[in-house]
């Protein structure tokens, strides 16, 4: 028996729970929480400061004010614990119970809870099936509602005005009952039979056909079923008892001068109590109905204000006219309970100070000011002082520390040793924003930071501050040391590139040391070793940049891998190099060849160097190497003594002439404009074009002049070498500045933009060296100011995007090693406009192969499915010319409630397969959100330079190889023997000798092909040409032209060209046609053969009809003979409006929010043949006949550009009307893989434009979360409702159960939710409530009696548990296993004892109950 008791004791100690349930409280429940009724509105006595009895702060209800002391002072001290004083009625206990004890107010008349009334959709309205307006009229005493119609013709829930009511009473007497106010609504709620209603609704759902009704019923059914399942009674939405918050949570603090500061809640409660007491009195006095009614209405309004002030009517205001802060306001928003106190706590043992550079530190160290350390490590010092016997008590120890005796400093040194601290720089945009360092005590008051970690923190030393936190427990120290130490975080989690890359001075120093000069001092000397070079250099016999020959010893990996053999062996070889490079070779880590250093080290090169070191030599060697590179860089930069002066800015000699020519051209355009030859817009575009070209030309001339300098070589010949100009070196090395900036210093500043983004056509021809005049300076300020305003906006927007991303992915954690799926996506190199934008190797690096990778030549398997493709693997794949690899992806992972390691692949921040427990969702969100501030905010208006560049009229090959056409390419040969493309989506590829795709080009409709399939070509060969300014309509059949509905003045108009004098027919807009009849006709062409019969489409009975669009210029005449491939009409493309491209941050947000673009393109719903039906007003009708012969119609606005023509075969999901794609359509018609490809590519386009690298897998992780809900199509035997959206994992679990029980599973379709919507629709109500729309989320959850299983990270942070990620995941797993074994042990003991005493055994109840 004792064992049993022990176990119970154990359980009671700490509250362990696995879930939290939320529900509506019944009146009895509220009374059971309460410690007494609050009857008076008084708070505290202003003279004695003692709480009034029965008031809002009453000590009898809520507990004593001082620990273990009753109010009147009769009982004091611990010995009376638990006694209730007979004089003042206060229980003697701890004062902190005033934080947890609740009271209640018995309401004289029931009151509706405003959340369930006004939070849309109104829950009360749904349950009662009445409109919100009607319920409000009843609740606020403006109308009666029929409760029981009796034998009268009235209907239940009918609304009637007061006048009506009295008439009906006269007519029917007391045959019927009607009420007003919350009592009436409560009666109605009580009269509802939920089970019956649910049955009726289910049958109605099955039988009804109307969409609107189905939606309405499904919504109501969902709410009613929630009540049914959760056991919550609907009439609890009407309050009879109001709980009162514990007084410590709504404090009243006396200020000096006899005034009080109080929480707004006290005011609100006071109003409720006052009105409630007044109502009680009125009821006792049997006051007239109208007065009572008014008082009841006021009580309802007072309670509304207390719960959610301002939701209905005007907000209640305090004395200072500002709205009072109600209970709802306490929890929602940035300053509410969730975001302010639960997710954003302040941390003890922390400090902050300014940072300064600490170039002498090692990478894992930081300099901590002594005074700061003393304060932060106080408890550790106290402990040490006691242990050492220096101080006897904590008080004495405190004195020692305050006096800062010498022994304290010694102890501080000891305490701090090997105790890492965490440094954080706000804003913490990704996980490298907090790193751990070993502190080194320093004098002064600023924290010293290692220069190489600045990139990760995005810190600089212009006054940035950082915060220090001390991990206290041993576990925390261990985690800080192993997981967060700066030297263990050398790669960016976003893209796997090294984060400890040198920048600025270091780069400049290394670059200067590794440059080579012609005819430097000591050129051509040979040295036997590096030490000899150093000696020569120190004696000024050679210069750093002189070319010399040196014997260099490299440590290479030993081929012999047997036991005891050394890992590296020396290898000596003679290199032609420079003095600087030879000197640098001393710091190369073993395993790297000298060739990696034997080139000028620019920033990119250094980054590549560190990356190579990491992959080849491991983490430790890399960290040491980076540190040494930094030391050398600083030293060499100092030795170099590079500085810049005005003379370094060389203004090109040709500048005047270039600018003069441009001005002449501009004058010429002005003249043309004046004489009316060009429009104002054309003139503006041309002027802007000329100036941007000029500015480029000046820049080019300047760079040519800057980048080389004349020099005499050893043989006395004059040659040119790369320049040693300081400004040029800074930009070229990547240390600071860019070609654009140099162009502004020494070339010309060029065109400036107005704040609205349009370009000012007057350029700034001066540069900073020559100086700007007043007008030029003014134009400059215009753009600069806009830049600053933009930056401020951008930061806020970017932060909000990150917050939404984190919220949608926060519960995605790697929970298992392998889900065993064989699905994946096919990865190809990303090609755009013929350029390889991203090579295949970059896209598959660090992924797991989904199917075997096979050598195309020998057909042998190189890598089996399930292999992690590392650097060597991708190099093999690239070498063998494999151009497509199927890899696992987060999108197809079959793990429920998480991801598996194989589908995710490599953890980019560590360089190895991701660990179980890694919070990959948050990392993905951070990786996408962190560079958000670098993206632009603006929408690009295509105009001027941009649009001119976009007009291409031919496509040429960039590499040698063989031309291949895709399957969609169709072309015909015309009379001249030219091949004319008649497909809309044809592409030409160039493949190399082993069949690998090298480039791919879209070839537009109507282009002339110059090379055919299979042709061998050289780089630079033209593949196709076309007219960029018009879009042709081409016939695929020959014959005689027969016009239909082509009537001058009705459907077409004659246009006479001013210049040539020729007339052409142009199709006019429907809106401009005169008569009603002519609006529906469509001008078109039929073809007649030699016998005068209409030419039919081969294999069908349809005649060939070729329709003309609005604006088409008809180039053939009626009755003219045409050949195959001839042009019938041309549509000028100038008429296409230039679309604004949404760029930057707004575009990323738009994609992740899955917004349907306005004027979206239309995709074909089915595979079939197109034809045009009868046009309606302003719309044209496109019909697709599928293979079964069913017709699908699309109505398309006339101004839209239809991409298909009559009788064309289209595939499902192909675009048929031009416009931006709608992601929802892509998902529906092309599936998940196509959708993910679309979103990934579009997001990457935005980031690539800014030069930001993000790995695809992060975007895929977000897309997975956007797809995490499915819509039920047919519910089978499951508990779901058709049309309901449910979590995919729940759906699959439920289906598994159905299949196991032999019932019908549900069918579903994927739906795409934007990130905000996805966050709000998560299963965890705690997470959703802390994100946005707190009220709505909590209302819904309470009605459903939702249970939060605490799966995600956010919920666990809020309830204060370890998060189920990283070490926390292991902790929770272990805890659950232990609980399981405890339970088994418990059952076993119970069984044994039952056996002993002969009583029947009962299995133990589970000790966990969801916490209410």
From Swiss-Prot:
Keywords: DNA-directed RNA polymerase, Magnesium, Metal-binding, Nucleotidyltransferase, Transcription, Transferase, Zinc. Pfam families: RNA_pol_Rpb1_1, RNA_pol_Rpb1_2, RNA_pol_Rpb1_3, RNA_pol_Rpb1_4, RNA_pol_Rpb1_5. CDD domains: RNAP_beta'_C, RNAP_beta'_N. Zn(2+) 1 binds at residues 70, 72, 85, 88. Its EC number is 2.7.7.6. One of its GO terms (biological process) is DNA-templated transcription. The keyword Metal-binding applies. GO terms for molecular function: DNA binding; DNA-directed RNA polymerase activity; magnesium ion binding; zinc ion binding. Mg(2+) binds at residues 460, 462, 464. SUPFAM superfamilies: beta and beta-prime subunits of DNA dependent RNA-polymerase (SSF64484). The RNAP catalytic core consists of 2 alpha, 1 beta, 1 beta' and 1 omega subunit. When a sigma factor is associated with the core the holoenzyme is formed, which can initiate transcription. This is DNA-directed RNA polymerase subunit beta'. It comes from Burkholderia thailandensis (strain ATCC 700388 / DSM 13276 / CCUG 48851 / CIP 106301 / E264).
